[in-house]
Amino acid sequence: MDTFPSIFPPGGDSRLNPEPEFQSMLIDERVRCEHHKHNYQALKIEHKRLQEEYVKSQNELKRVLNEKQTNQEKFQLLLEELRGELVEKVKDMEAMKLQILTPQKLELVKAQLQQELEAPMRERFRTLDEEVERYRAEYNKLRYEHTFLKSEFEHQKEELTRISEEEKMKYKSEVARLEKDKEELHNQLLSVDPTRDSKRVEQLVREKTHLLQKLKSLEAEVAELRAEKENSGAQVENVQRIQVRQLAEMQATLRSLEAEKQSAKLQAERLEKELQSSNEQNTCLISKLHKADREISTLTSQVKELKHANKLEITDVKLEAARAKSELERERNKIQSELDGLQSDNEILKSTVEHHKVLLVEKDRELIRKVQAAKEEGYQKLVVLQDEKLELENRLSDLEKMKVEHDVWRQSEKDQCEEKLRASQAAEEAARRELQSIRLKLQQQIVNTEKAEKEKLENSELKQQISHLQIQVTSLTQSENDLLNSNQMLKDMVERLKQECRHLRSQAEKVQLEVEKTLEEKQIQWLEEKHKLHERITDREEKYNQAKEKLQRAATAQKKRKSLHENKLKRLQEKVEVLEAKKEELETENQVLNRQNVPFEEYTRLQKRLKDIQRRHNEFRSLILVPNMPPAASVNPANFQSSAIVPGVELSFPPHLQEEQHQRELSLLRKRLEELETTQRKQLEELGSPGE
């Protein structure tokens, strides 16, 4: 801005001359400003790019550090896993020790064997007792049902007898009353004049209707008695069915008892086989015990040899461990001094880093003034960062190599630990190999710690491994002591087992003798039960055959009686229908005669005709009521034809004769009913005796 006064002229005449110069200067300034602006923007973009690269490099450094930490954590996890595997294998050893037989375990095995042998026998006896109780309950139930049915049958029988007696008394009283009425009517007929016959006939017709109603009521009673008879027959059939069902149930129970007897025989045979197999198993176990005694003796001799060899090897290992310990202490001191130097270098590097940070801040301030210098310095820094990146990559590759070597070392250590657990004889040689491998690995780690930044943790791991090895050495000594104690315990156990085997042999012999005795007793009991069952079966079969024969006889007799009664009832029904037809004809003729006046001569002639008809009718009735007469002579159509010759005159006979005939028919019917009742009672008694 100081150049402007020198440009403008002092005079006023020269105003037009400086304007183009001023414009050219403005244009130049504008061009410079634009150039500076472009440069500033380019420098700004470059500065952003450099900052981004710086952030990326820091992120990569953090990532590398995180990966290193993760690798260290993985190594620690591997160590913990190996320790856990060692603990598990120690537990497995203890479990194997616990699996050795002890006297308590032997007692438990004995108790289990005894329970397994006694449980099925007890279960079988319990089931047999339950079955006996069940059969007993069924027998009591059947007996109770039989008594109940018998009592019901007797009660029904008594009711039938009572009802029949009441009916008899009623019929007898009615018969006596009817006979008295008949005598009175007969006397009245003899005393009455013939002129008053018409009125008397009307009265007799009324009485006849009344008697017909009584006859219908008596027929209804006869039908009721027939229905009662059918009911009694149905009850008898029900009783027969019940008896047949009970017999079938008894046969089923007998079959089930035979099946149970066979199953008991099979079970006895199976128990004998089990006893034989148990004896064979006892012999096998005794032979196995002898073999175990021999193996234990060989193992004791081997253990003694191993003890002697272990003592010699332990002394060698102790000497080598002392030497290795002194060497490790020397190496530890060297590593400690190197670590101190590395820590001092690390502090110097930290201070340089802080100084660089300060310089970076100052350079950021000077970037506005010195863009070109900043650009060059930026390029130099990029080169330095790339070099550092290459160094970091080299370190990462070295760390990966160390990781691979460490993994190999871990795998070898794991294999060595497994070999230690599997074979106690090679434990000392594995320890020597581990010490040599540890020395080599320590040397490799010392060489690698010159290139790494954080090797202090690895040294601590090495210290832990050394302490772990010392612990392993102490554990080996303890395991030797445990082996000595276990060998002594095994010897004691062998002696105890021998004594227990002898005791078990004696107990097994006693148990075998007891089982044989019990089997003999049970066989005797089973034979007695079998004999008793055979006797019961024979008795039941005899009773069943007798009852069956009685039932067959009763059934045949009942069928015959039933057929005879059915035939007789059919005949009686036919005759009753004929008589009803005759009665209807007589009623019609009687009505006709009532309308007409009959002279005395015709009356006498009709009386004679009536006597002839009564005689024929009595003959016909005797044929109907007497069952021994042939059915061919029961009906004479000529008589009916002759009776029908005089339709208007011959039915004017006196009514008292009709009443007498009716009374006779009723008396004959009562007799037949009484005979039927007696036959039914006899049949019921015959059916009741086989049921009892």
Curated annotation (Swiss-Prot):
It comes from the Eukaryota. It is found in: Cytoplasm, Cytoskeleton, Microtubule organizing center, Centrosome, Centriole. The keyword Phosphoprotein applies. Keywords: Cilium biogenesis/degradation, Coiled coil, Cytoplasm, Cytoskeleton, Phosphoprotein. GO terms for biological process: cilium assembly; establishment of centrosome localization; protein localization to centrosome; vesicle docking. Signal peptide: none annotated. The modification Phosphoserine is found at S689. The keyword Phosphoprotein applies. Residues 32-625, 656-689 form a coiled coil. One of its GO terms (cellular component) is ciliary transition fiber. Interacts with CEP164 and IFT20. Component of the distal appendage region of the centriole involved in the initiation of primary cilium assembly. May collaborate with IFT20 in the trafficking of ciliary membrane proteins from the Golgi complex to the cilium during the initiation of primary cilium assembly. This is Centrosomal protein of 83 kDa. The lineage of its organism: Eukaryota, Metazoa, Chordata, Craniata, Vertebrata. The gene is Cep83.
